[in-house]
């Protein structure tokens, strides 16, 4: 139940089970920044045609100070991927499926039996940050720029150059528009919305995606957790629930740790930025795993 990237990517990988996807939305295809690791992309099991760009470097700035990160990241064209995946499975848009139990749903007054997997997305409850992203004409760069500001507590801004456009945005609490970097290019479009910032939640039965609040606390990225749960859910459907339960425990431990780190950084935001960037200014750090960018930076800022 749910036709976002979580539900559609899972259905794509479970095609031999003949899954049915119910989606409240009119049509699939959400716009997002879509920066993920190569590790995450590999586990989605989709074609490389959905990769718009590859990045080997991130520059993180605070005032006139910089920290460089060696990375291995990809830009996933999530909008096009969702549209294409919806065409290869039984996909029903504009359909509100009410989950009655892990084995039953209610669709337009009719009860349907079967294994229910919740991919219904975030319910809007709990803490959230606001995000806005502007799409401009392309610039000549292959480096992602991340900007931290004293007044944007717990948030950041970004510039992501792609071959055919440039993604420029900001997220944080309150009005984040003033933190969006200026770009001397023609504006093409604007999109955005709220992003959950919460600890992982308990959900009865099988679930995947933002319904679990399994998103990176600092950036709000959730595709990584989708990729990690695809294979464990398959094993659970085949009769072995242990891998799913173990992966949930692992995700919960890491995400809740991230939540605590970010909460600590928010309480001493200005001090953390000044101290951290004074110690790491001009240095280059290597990021090898999915959470390292956040754990590495925030951990060093706080210690």
Which role does the model predict for each range below?
Residues 27, 65-67, 212-215:
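A short, flexible beta-alpha/helix-coil linker loop
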Residues 30-34, 72-73, 171, 218-222:
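Short, solvent-exposed loop/turn segments at secondary-structure boundaries
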Residues 235-303:
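C-terminal helical "tail/cap" subdomain of flavin- and related membrane-associated enzymes
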Residues 3, 13, 83-204, 212-215:
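Predominantly flavin-linked oxidoreductase catalytic cores and closely associated redox partners
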Residues 35-84, 90-94:
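A conserved beta-strand/loop capping segment in the N-terminal third of enzymes
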Residues 166, 196-259:
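Conserved mid-domain beta->alpha element of the FAD-binding
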Residues 1-5, 12-32:
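Glycine-rich FAD pyrophosphate-binding loop
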């Amino acid at each position: 139940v749910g036709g976002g990237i979580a539900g559609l990517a899972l259905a794509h990988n479970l095609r031999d089970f003949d899954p049915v996807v119910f989606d409240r939305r009119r049509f699939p295809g959400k716009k997002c920044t879509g920066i993920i690791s190569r590790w995450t992309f590999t586990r989605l099991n989709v074609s490389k045609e959905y990769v718009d760009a590859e990045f080997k470097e991130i520059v993180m700035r605070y005032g006139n100070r910089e920290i460089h990160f060696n990375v291995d990241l990809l830009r996933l064209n999530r909008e096009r991927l969702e549209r294409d995946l919806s065409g290869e499975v039984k996909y029903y848009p504009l359909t509100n499926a009410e989950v009655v139990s892990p084995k039953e749903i209610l669709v337009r007054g009719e009860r349907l039996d079967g294994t229910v997997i919740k991919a219904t997305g975030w319910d809007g409850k709990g803490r959230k940050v606001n995000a806005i992203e502007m799409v401009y004409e392309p610039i000549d760069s292959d480096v992602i720029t991340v900007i931290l500001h004293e007044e944007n507590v717990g948030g950041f801004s970004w510039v992501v150059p792609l071959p055919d456009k440039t993604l420029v945005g900001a997220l944080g609490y309150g009005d984040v528009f003033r933190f969006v970097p200026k770009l001397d290019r023609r504006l093409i479009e604007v999109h955005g919305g709220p992003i959950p910032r919460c600890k992982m939640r308990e959900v009865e039965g099988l679930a995947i995606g933002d319904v679990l609040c399994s998103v990176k606390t600092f950036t709000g990225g959730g595709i990584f957790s989708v990729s990690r749960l695809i294979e464990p859910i398959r094993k659970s459907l085949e009769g072995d629930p242990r891998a799913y339960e173990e992966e949930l425990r692992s995700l919960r431990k890491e995400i809740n740790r991230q939540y605590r780190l970010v909460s600590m950084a928010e309480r001493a935001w200005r001090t953390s930025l000044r101290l951290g960037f004074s110690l790491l200014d001009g240095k280059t750090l290597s990021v090898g795993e999915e959470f390292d960018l956040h754990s590495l930076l925030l951990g060093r800022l706080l210690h």
